[in-house]
Amino acid sequence: MRNYILVASGAVIGVTLRYGCMLVISEQLVLLFVNIVGSFTMGILNAYFEHRAHAELQLLLTTGLLGSFTTFSAFSAEWLDYMMHSPLVAMGYALVMTFSCIAAAFVGYVIMKRGERA
């Protein structure tokens, strides 16, 4: 039961942060922003937790907070909307989102690893 509470608590924080971003960032960019920031942060946290046993903190931050801050379902819905109007735009959107998020996660991971060595 404790794990459910940790994930739910993180999720409340994450979705609140995402909603805050939705209020101040243009509708066209907000999902790209939250997914890139979330991926970057996930890279940092993955590197941090790699050799540390903090299962509860990891659940709170990764599954709960970042899982609700980032959003694959909204990305999929936006992609479908773009696809119905312009398949070329949809393809570009999918490529930019996917590669940007992967790159952000990688950069976050590398930065954290380099910081640990310093």
What does each model-identified segment do?
Residues M1-A118:
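Membrane-interface helix-loop junctions in multi-pass transporters/channels
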